[in-house]
Swiss-Prot record:
<feature type="binding site">
    <location>
        <begin position="11"/>
        <end position="19"/>
    </location>
    <ligand>
        <name>ATP</name>
    </ligand>
</feature>
<keyword id="KW-0963">Cytoplasm</keyword>
<dbReference type="GO" id="GO:0036431">
    <property type="term" value="F:dCMP kinase activity"/>
</dbReference>
<dbReference type="InterPro" id="IPR027417">
    <property type="entry name" value="P-loop_NTPase"/>
</dbReference>
<keyword id="KW-0418">Kinase</keyword>
<dbReference type="Pfam" id="PF02224">
    <property type="entry name" value="Cytidylate_kin"/>
</dbReference>
<dbReference type="InterPro" id="IPR011994">
    <property type="entry name" value="Cytidylate_kinase_dom"/>
</dbReference>
<dbReference type="GO" id="GO:0005524">
    <property type="term" value="F:ATP binding"/>
</dbReference>
<dbReference type="GO" id="GO:0005829">
    <property type="term" value="C:cytosol"/>
</dbReference>
<protein>
    <recommendedName>
        <fullName>Cytidylate kinase</fullName>
        <ecNumber>2.7.4.25</ecNumber>
    </recommendedName>
</protein>
<dbReference type="GO" id="GO:0036430">
    <property type="term" value="F:CMP kinase activity"/>
</dbReference>
<comment type="similarity">
    <text>Belongs to the cytidylate kinase family. Type 1 subfamily.</text>
</comment>
<keyword id="KW-0067">ATP-binding</keyword>
<dbReference type="InterPro" id="IPR003136">
    <property type="entry name" value="Cytidylate_kin"/>
</dbReference>
<keyword id="KW-0808">Transferase</keyword>
<dbReference type="GO" id="GO:0006220">
    <property type="term" value="P:pyrimidine nucleotide metabolic process"/>
</dbReference>
<keyword id="KW-0547">Nucleotide-binding</keyword>
C-alpha cells in the first residue's frame, strides 16, 4: 500500500463520518476533505438566491458560477468558504440540512464538485468523507469505509449537534427527516448512497468514535507493512 493512501469514508446522515474523518486526518497527518460541506455550501447559495430546489437547470447554472474552498485554520479545524465568505457555521442550519439532498441529486452539481474533489486527492494522503466517495469520486482509494448507525441513534446525534448551535428539534421530527434523507440519497440517479463492493462496513450505533478511528488507523498501519 502507498504510504499516503487515500481513505474514503461513506455513510448516511448522522453516522459520524465528519467526526471520524476529522480525528483520523489529525492522527495520520492527512488532509481532511468534507465533501458534504461543499454540497451544503451550494445549497446555502441556492437558498440565499431564491433558486427553486426543484429547478435542476437553475441549480446547475448556480453551481457553475460558485466557488467552494476548504481550508484548515490555525487550530486545525476545517473552514468552508463560499465565494470567499466563511460559511462554516451557516451551512449546518436546519434549512440547509433540508435542502442539501435536493441540491446534491443534480448531476451537473455533482460533476462540478467531484472534479474539484478529485483534484484535491490527486497527490494521495487525504481522508475524504461523503456519500459516494468509494463508488464514484475515489473508486481507487486504498481504504474504503462505510460508516452507519440506526436512524434513532443518528437522529439523537444530529439533535445534539444542532442543540449546541442553538437549534432545538424534536426527536420524532429528526428521525423522519433522517429517514427521508436516506430515501433521497439511496434512490438518486447520480452517485446514490451505497457501500462500495470492497468497503468495510462499520455499524457504530454503540461504538465510541475513538474505537472507530483506531480500527481504521490499524488498517492503514497493516497496509503499510504489506
Amino acid at each position: 500500500m502507498n504510504s499516503f493512501p487515500n481513505i474514503a469514508i461513506d455513510g448516511p446522515a448522522g453516522a459520524g463520518k465528519s467526526t471520524v474523518a476529522r480525528l483520523l486526518s489529525k492522527e495520520l497527518g492527512f488532509l481532511y476533505i468534507d465533501t458534504g460541506a461543499m454540497y451544503r455550501a451550494v445549497a446555502l447559495k441556492a437558498i440565499r438566491k431564491g433558486v427553486d430546489l426543484a429547478d435542476q437547470p437553475g441549480l446547475s447554472r448556480l453551481a457553475a458560477v460558485t466557488s467552494v474552498n476548504l481550508k484548515t485554520d490555525a487550530e486545525g479545524n476545517l473552514r468552508v468558504f463560499l465565494d470567499g465568505e466563511d460559511v462554516t457555521e451557516e451551512i449546518r442550519s436546519p434549512a440547509v440540512s433540508k435542502a442539501v439532498s435536493l441540491v446534491a441529486r443534480v448531476p451537473a452539481v455533482r460533476e462540478r464538485l467531484v472534479e474539484l474533489q478529485r483534484a484535491m486527492a490527486s497527490g494521495g494522503g487525504v481522508v475524504m468523507e461523503g456519500r459516494d466517495i468509494g463508488t464514484v469520486v475515489l473508486p481507487d482509494a486504498e481504504i474504503k469505509i462505510f460508516l452507519t448507525a440506526s436512524p434513532e441513534e443518528r437522529a439523537r446525534r444530529r439533535r445534539e449537534e444542532l442543540a449546541a448551535r442553538g437549534y432545538i428539534v424534536d426527536q420524532h421530527q429528526m428521525v423522519n427527516e433522517i429517514t427521508e434523507r436516506d430515501r433521497i440519497d439511496t434512490t438518486r440517479a447520480a452517485g446514490p448512497l451505497v457501500p462500495a463492493a470492497d468497503a468495510e462496513i462499520i455499524d457504530c450505533s454503540s461504538m465510541p468514535v475513538e474505537k472507530v478511528v483506531k480500527m481504521i488507523v490499524a488498517r492503514v498501519s497493516a497496509g503499510r507493512r504489506e
